[in-house]
Swiss-Prot record:
InterPro entries linked: Metallo-B-lactamas (IPR001279), RibonucZ/Hydroxyglut_hydro (IPR036866), UPF0173 (IPR022877), UPF0173_UPF0282_UlaG_hydrolase (IPR050114)
UniProt organism field: Paracoccus denitrificans (strain Pd 1222)
UniProt-recorded name of the protein: UPF0173 metal-dependent hydrolase Pden_0574
Record flagged with keyword Transferase: no
Pfam families: Lactamase_B_2
Length: 230
């Protein structure tokens, strides 16, 4: 298994027989070196979206067309894009599980909002979501954009993820302190990786706060396009 941060909330996850691009915002992302785009998307088999906001959907449509790969996510958004954008898609909903190249991906709840820009303003894009991704002896919790929520209790007990990819930039999502509290209260992670931070001054956060709040947990500060040891 190999995980690479693409900046902001974007990741490239190589697991089982799948290469999954999660929330691939590359073009215009101040953290991502655009001359490494081809390297970032090479061999991708699926695109997995947590919600419809532009800093998460990003390059989804262009990559899906270029590589002829399916976009996976909440049914409402995927169905809209299949109808109006002509892409291949796999839409499902919370509680559902899909098999992506041998990795079992279950959609779970998040607490945020979800829309994309239309000609006359924001367009509803279905509910925001997170994911539990099981494969190669691990379960990875991808929080998507969220705050602390009570659902995390049963999500932790039922899915028992050992790796957490947690939004922690504050302002639009939980910050480092809240992410640490959620991880400590509801999960038993061995490894935690923060994301959705440092992209803009508004999202400036100190990962040392997360580390201090999670004694005994390996907290990895990701570097863009540097494989993360798991």
């Amino acid at each position: 298994m190999k995980l690479t941060w693409l900046g902001h909330s974007g990741f490239r996850l190589e697991i089982e027989q799948a290469v999954i691009l999660i929330d691939p915002w590359l073009s215009g992302n101040p953290m991502f070196p655009e001359d490494r785009r081809d390297e970032a998307i090479q061999g991708a088999t699926h695109i997995l979206l947590t919600h419809g906001h532009g800093d998460h959907t990003g390059d989804t449509l262009s990559i899906a067309r270029e590589l002829k790969i399916p976009v996976v996510g909440i049914y409402d958004l995927i169905n809209t894009w299949q109808t109006h954008q002509g892409i291949e898609g796999l839409g499902f909903n919370k509680g559902g599980t899909v098999d992506l190249g041998g990795a079992k991906v279950t959609m779970v709840n998040a607490s945020h909002s979800s829309s994309f820009d239309g000609n006359e303003g924001p367009v509803y894009a279905g509910h925001e979501s997170g994911y539990m991704i099981a494969g190669e002896g691990h379960v990875i919790y991808v929080s998507g954009d969220t705050d602390i929520m009570a659902d995390m209790q049963w999500m932790g007990e039922y899915h028992q993820p050992d790796i957490g990819i947690l939004c922690a930039g504050g302002h639009f999502t939980m910050d480092m302190d809240r992410a640490a509290w959620a991880a400590r209260k509801y999960f038993d992670f061995k490894t935690v990786i923060p994301c959705h931070y440092k992209t803009f001054p508004l999202l400036a956060q100190d990962a040392e706060v997360l580390k201090a709040g999670l004694p005994g947990v390996q907290v990895i500060e990701p570097e863009v396009m540097q494989p993360i040891p798991l």
